[in-house]
């Protein structure tokens, strides 16, 4: 009797525990998604208490700038009107360091900051040295010539004389370091003397001179602390709500983020918008596919075919015109009116006429398309490679002898890939806090519910089995009683004397 009582108590205890576990599992199924969402919102907003704040402030991801130059093989022939021939040189790789300063939190749920960048050459990652010589178009001479095309002949003749006096030619042979970070040029000194605010270059001219050890402008972005719906969106850049480089309000709009983080909880219908000070415009990337980076699920976003399309192909881009062939963007209005063009490397995704006009170009998707891999739950980039090309429109200009007989052509100068991937301790912390723990909680809720249901069945099964035993005992007891009554009745019948006249028959075996 004691063992049966203990079994009943154990079964009841297990049932009670099962009830608690099942209830906890059910509550978790209802509450965990909300808890995870709140934790994500808490940790991705721009707030000193958030997990991602230090990541936002001092980007721990190693970024690399890989630069490829187009070495002009036949400069003299180009001056005679022949087709340009180029050879790709590089990559010349630089480690890019970024840090934010002057961080100021404002009362309207925004934060203002300056982000400084610096670059260090990485010989072990490069295919060549900064001392390598490259033949490129003389950007100052050829761009100034195109800009002066419609000016009076007298001015063009004066310019020809000035170029000759300063020893300026249509093509220059300079080292990688000089092209990147600047070289002394007498024309720059002359311009700075008489037109001091015309160029940002002080004494030296270099394609990346203005980027090294400098900031990309004063960004003011929404923190998401008070209003999650606007998290990371740019409110102003250099105090402006829109720029004035282009010819339409839509093209002048500052849309999206500053290009480092995006709103969490993305779907395949989401897009990535960001403002690029270097391109002087907002850009929009579209969803392509799901993927996995180091065990972390990602969404890959790529450039649409319309990113650099001209106005005739994609009317919303009409504001970026005057346009040439589709696939290149005229950035002259934000680059001192120099005839510079932005595009994908090797004129990938552009009108084939552009690549066919220059020998040595081989556009392909694998090498020349850009992408960003984003963790969709947090909106944080895991892996990215942004690739862009800078080209110069050159042509013969009547009255300027240095331009010779150059046929009109958009000649590539260089292309670069700005790449970075999360790694090391940062990757491990991110994976543990924002991927592994939510995954553990997700599975734990169903395990608890299933285990609770199993334990709940124990007292039920015990009760059923106990009732069966009682029924069997009662049935066997009742049957035994009937048998005893039958035997007793039979015995009494044998002991009773037979009535007179009854003949007893002999029992035979």
Swiss-Prot record:
GO molecular function: high-density lipoprotein particle receptor activity; lipid binding; low-density lipoprotein particle binding; scavenger receptor activity
GO biological process: cholesterol efflux; cholesterol import; plasma lipoprotein particle clearance; recognition of apoptotic cell; transcytosis
Entry comment on modification after translation: N-glycosylated.
Domain of life: Eukaryota
Intrachain S-S bonds: 251-384
Keyword annotations from UniProtKB, A to Z: Cell membrane, Disulfide bond, Glycoprotein, Membrane, Receptor, Transmembrane, Transmembrane helix
Topology Cytoplasmic: residue spans: 1-11, 461-509
Places the protein is found: Cell membrane; Membrane, Caveola
Transmembrane portions of the chain: 12-32, 440-460
Cellular component terms per the entry's GO annotation: apical plasma membrane; basolateral plasma membrane; caveola; cell surface; plasma membrane
Glycosylation site positions: 102, 108, 173, 212, 255, 310, 330, 383
Keyword Nucleotidyltransferase: no
Membrane topology field: Multi-pass membrane protein
Ranges of the Extracellular topological domain: 33-439
Family per similarity comment: Belongs to the CD36 family.
Subunit and partners: The C-terminal region binds to PDZK1.
PANTHER family: SCAVENGER RECEPTOR CLASS B MEMBER 1 (PTHR11923:SF110), SCAVENGER RECEPTOR CLASS B TYPE-1 SR-B1 (PTHR11923)
Function: Receptor for different ligands such as phospholipids, cholesterol ester, lipoproteins, phosphatidylserine and apoptotic cells. Receptor for HDL, mediating selective uptake of cholesteryl ether and HDL-dependent cholesterol efflux. Also facilitates the flux of free and esterified cholesterol between the cell surface and apoB-containing lipoproteins and modified lipoproteins, although less efficiently than HDL. May be involved in the phagocytosis of apoptotic cells, via its phosphatidylserine binding activity.
Protein name, as recorded: Scavenger receptor class B member 1
Annotated source species: Sus scrofa
Gene coding for it: SCARB1
């Amino acid at each position: 009797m004691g063992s049966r009582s203990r079994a009943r108590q154990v079964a009841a205890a297990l049932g009670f525990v099962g009830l608690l576990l099942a209830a906890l599992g059910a509550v978790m199924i209802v509450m965990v998604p909300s808890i995870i969402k709140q934790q994500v919102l808490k940790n991705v907003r721009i707030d000193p208490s958030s997990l991602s704040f230090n990541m936002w402030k001092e980007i721990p991801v190693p970024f690399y700038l890989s630069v490829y130059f187009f070495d002009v093989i036949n400069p003299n022939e180009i001056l005679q009107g022949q087709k340009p021939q180029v050879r790709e040189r590089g990559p010349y790789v630089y480690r890019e360091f970024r840090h934010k300063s002057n961080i100021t939190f404002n009362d309207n749920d925004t934060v203002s900051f300056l982000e400084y960048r610096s670059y260090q050459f990485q010989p072990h990652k490069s295919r060549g040295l900064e001392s390598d010589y490259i033949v490129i178009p003389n950007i100052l001479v050829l761009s100034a010539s195109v800009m002066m095309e419609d000016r009076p002949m007298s001015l063009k003749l004066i310019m020809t004389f000035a170029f000759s006096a300063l020893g300026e030619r249509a093509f220059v042979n300079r080292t990688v370091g000089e092209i990147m970070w600047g070289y002394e040029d007498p024309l720059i000194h002359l311009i700075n003397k008489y037109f001091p605010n015309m160029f940002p270059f002080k004494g030296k001219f270099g394609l990346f001179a203005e980027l090294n050890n400098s900031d990309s402008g004063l960004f003011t972005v929404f923190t998401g602390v008070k209003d999650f719906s606007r998290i990371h969106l740019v409110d102003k850049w250099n105090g402006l709500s829109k720029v004035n480089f282009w010819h339409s309000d839509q093209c002048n709009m500052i849309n999206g983020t500053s290009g480092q983080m995006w709103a969490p909880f993305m779907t395949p219908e989401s897009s990535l918008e960001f403002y690029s000070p270097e391109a002087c415009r907002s850009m929009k990337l579209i969803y392509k596919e799901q993927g996995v980076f180091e065990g972390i699920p990602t969404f890959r976003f790529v450039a649409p075919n319309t990113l650099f399309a001209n106005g005739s192909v994609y009317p919303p881009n009409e504001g970026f015109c005057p346009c040439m062939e589709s696939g290149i963007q005229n950035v002259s209005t934000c680059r001192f009116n120099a005839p510079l063009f932005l595009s994908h490397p090797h004129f990938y995704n552009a009108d084939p006429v552009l690549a066919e006009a220059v020998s040595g170009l081989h556009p392909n998707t694998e090498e020349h398309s850009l992408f960003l891999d984003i963790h969709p739950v947090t909106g944080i980039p895991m892996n990215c490679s942004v690739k862009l090309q800078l080209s110069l429109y050159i042509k013969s200009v009547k009255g300027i002898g240095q331009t010779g007989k150059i046929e009109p052509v958009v000649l590539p100068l260089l292309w670069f890939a700005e790449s970075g991937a999360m790694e090391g301790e940062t990757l491990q912390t991110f994976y543990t806090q924002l991927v592994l723990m939510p995954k553990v909680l997700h599975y734990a809720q169903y395990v608890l519910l299933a285990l609770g249901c199993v334990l709940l069945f124990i007292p039920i099964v015990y009760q059923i089995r106990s009732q069966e035993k009682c029924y069997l005992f009662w049935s066997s007891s009742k049957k035994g009683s009937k048998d005893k009554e039958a035997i007793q009745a039979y015995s009494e019948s044998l002991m009773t004397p037979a009535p007179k006249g009854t003949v007893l028959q002999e029992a035979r075996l």
